């Protein structure tokens, strides 16, 4: 099946939809634009792709003319501000979703810019926005880059409808209604959509009011309360419609669309993707983002792990849906026939690799629990901990002719692995699916910080680590755990960072990479960062915002690096922990080296001051 049209010459008449995206066009099921375009194509609609249009004028948006039904707009696979800036708010030099990996192809706040250009070009034409940027910014939200609470992206973009979550069934329904001639501003009963209405409007679903924007942007307690209400209503079984006030209008979020069934998910992944970037990018060096996913298989969606700093639950939901084993095997067979396949499946995973859709009977019938997490602070008694189906999947994939090795590179939820009384899966992972290093995410060692993160206790990680190395030794292999760690998360004090540094030293862990907490839209941790409150308990949370303290917390996680020693000393003095400065086995750094000691033994390269008296010394003849 060829790529979808990217030029007017490839079109046969007026397209039904034009998808405008901030990413380059990659026709692979790891890219939202590819999935939505193929789903609509399968329903009989014609779709044109407008990837990374020149945004400084509206001319590029006139390329295909008007779509018959609507423009569909997304920023790409990542929020455009996260794609463009580091946590230190420095501009990134690269962009793996753009030609040659170079930055500069999409604007900041891409969804808003694209929609405004479309309005400039065509005026009152239906515009539907979706994807991560739209989904996580659907309500009034804290924006880290301006350090303020911004309005819903639906308001600023002037789009007609916002779709949130995974969009296949939402777009199918919207496309059907638009095709039947229903005006876009009359579509008000589709799940998974957000829209603006007059104050007199009565939602089609039972609703809850979460606040006025003017209050939410100034009152942090009201903001935290609103976030809690949002969080409690993101399940399709019991979630209410949510209403937010904007001057003389209201924003209405209908309840979430139900997740795709296994059968529906199988059909989505069986669509005729080209599984490559468009050939027009070849001259620029291709699209680097394809490299990680080209020979990988996504077997699930959603995540009941529900870490507070992660937006997956707010976007994909806590309900896990998995593809059938047969569907994954068909994809694996297809991968073996692709150009460039060398026998290695790089991943069989998802948001959390070891979750399948058979985890909880209650969740299937009534939704996930409203005020309770599945895994933290301890695993729910209703949770069915079973890796048998995933184990079967891995075994069958590696048995396919042409497959030499199958790796699991997505994150594994280690507390869920430990809870499995059958060790077969654990041993299988260690024996066959680790490429020398297994990446896991303990994130911290301070249990009160881990609680605010929504992560399991450090004791749980220690038990996992001990079991991993025990099995590794029994198998006679040399493999290592690589822990992901985070500094400056809300709740993390300087004392907590020092505790983590001591934990790392004691366990002989020298992390090469650490992540400073990045407050991205749509997460509970970002709510804590802005308000200084835990939205679930109302309790005050310490937030490290001071630049110097954030720098010190980060340096403590890499205390062993000489470049960090001065910063670590300052942190220890600041915390009153001078006992950790010295030469003892428990010390983190040595005392400050005096300037004279630094230069001791070095050749003095300074030129003598003044003129040399007498004759210049004669050069020796060789």
Task: Briefly describe each language-model feature range.
Residues 15-21, 28-65:
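Nucleic acid-processing catalytic cores of prokaryotic defense/repair systems
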């Amino acid at each position: 099946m060829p790529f979808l049209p990217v030029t007017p010459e490839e079109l046969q008449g007026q397209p039904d939809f034009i998808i405008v995206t901030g990413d380059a066009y990659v026709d692979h099921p790891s890219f939202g634009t590819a999935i939505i375009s193929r789903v609509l194509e399968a329903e009989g609609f014609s779709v044109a792709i407008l990837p990374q249009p020149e945004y400084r004028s509206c001319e590029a948006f006139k390329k295909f003319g008007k779509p018959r039904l609507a423009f569909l707009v997304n920023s790409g696979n990542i929020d455009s501000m996260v794609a463009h800036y580091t946590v230190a708010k420095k501009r990134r030099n690269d962009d793996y979703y753009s030609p040659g990996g170079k930055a500069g192809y999409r604007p900041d706040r891409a969804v808003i810019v694209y929609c405004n250009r479309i309005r400039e070009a065509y005026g009152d034409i239906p515009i539907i926005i979706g994807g991560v940027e739209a989904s996580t910014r659907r309500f009034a939200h804290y924006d880290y880059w301006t350090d303020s609470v911004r309005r819903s992206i639906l308001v600023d973009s002037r789009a007609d409808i916002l779709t949130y979550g995974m969009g296949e069934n939402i777009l199918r329904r919207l496309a059907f209604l638009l095709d039947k001639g229903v005006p876009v501003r009359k579509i008000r009963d589709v799940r998974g959509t957000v829209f603006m209405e007059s104050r007199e409007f009565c939602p089609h679903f039972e609703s809850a009011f979460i606040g006025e924007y003017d209050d939410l942007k100034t009152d942090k307690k009201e903001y935290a309360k609103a976030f809690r209400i949002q969080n409690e209503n993101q399940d399709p079984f019991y979630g209410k419609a949510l209403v937010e006030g904007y001057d003389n209008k209201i924003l209405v979020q209908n309840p979430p669309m139900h997740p795709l069934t296994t059968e529906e998910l199988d059909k989505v992944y069986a669509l005729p993707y080209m599984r490559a970037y468009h050939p027009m990018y070849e001259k620029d060096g291709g699209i680097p983002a394809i490299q990680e996913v080209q020979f990988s298989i996504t077997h699930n969606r959603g995540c009941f792990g529900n870490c507070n700093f992660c937006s997956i639950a707010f976007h994909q939901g806590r309900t896990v849906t998995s593809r059938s084993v047969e569907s994954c095997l068909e994809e694996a067979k297809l991968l073996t026939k692709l150009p460039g396949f060398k026998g290695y499946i790089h991943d069989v995973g998802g948001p959390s690799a070891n979750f399948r859709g058979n985890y909880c009977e209650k969740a299937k019938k009534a939704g996930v629990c409203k005020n309770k997490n599945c895994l933290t602070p301890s695993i729910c008694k209703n949770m069915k901990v079973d890796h048998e189906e995933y184990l079967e999947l891995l075994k069958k994939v590696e048995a396919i002719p042409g497959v030499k090795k199958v790796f699991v590179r997505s994150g594994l939820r280690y507390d869920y692995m430990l809870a499995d009384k059958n060790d077969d899966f654990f041993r299988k992972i260690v024996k066959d699916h680790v490429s020398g290093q297994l990446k896991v995410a303990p994130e911290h060692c301070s249990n009160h910080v881990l609680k605010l993160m929504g992560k399991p206790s450090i004791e749980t990680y220690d038990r996992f680590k001990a079991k991993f190395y025990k099995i590794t030794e029994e198998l006679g292999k040399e493999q290592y755990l690589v822990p992901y760690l985070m500094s400056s998360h809300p709740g993390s004090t300087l004392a907590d960072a020092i505790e983590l540094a001591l934990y790392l030293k004691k366990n002989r862990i020298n992390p090469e990479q650490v992540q400073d907490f990045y407050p991205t839209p749509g997460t509970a941790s970002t709510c804590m960062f802005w308000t200084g409150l835990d939205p679930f308990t109302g309790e005050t949370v310490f937030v490290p915002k001071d630049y110097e303290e954030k720098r010190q917390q980060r340096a403590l996680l890499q205390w062993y690096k000489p470049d960090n020693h001065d910063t670590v000393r300052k942190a220890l003095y600041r915390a009153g922990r001078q006992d950790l400065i010295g030469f003892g086995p428990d010390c983190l750094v040595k005392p400050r080296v005096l300037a004279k000691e630094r230069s001791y033994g070095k050749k003095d390269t300074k030129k003598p001051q003044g003129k040399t008296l007498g004759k210049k010394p004669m050069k020796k003849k060789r």
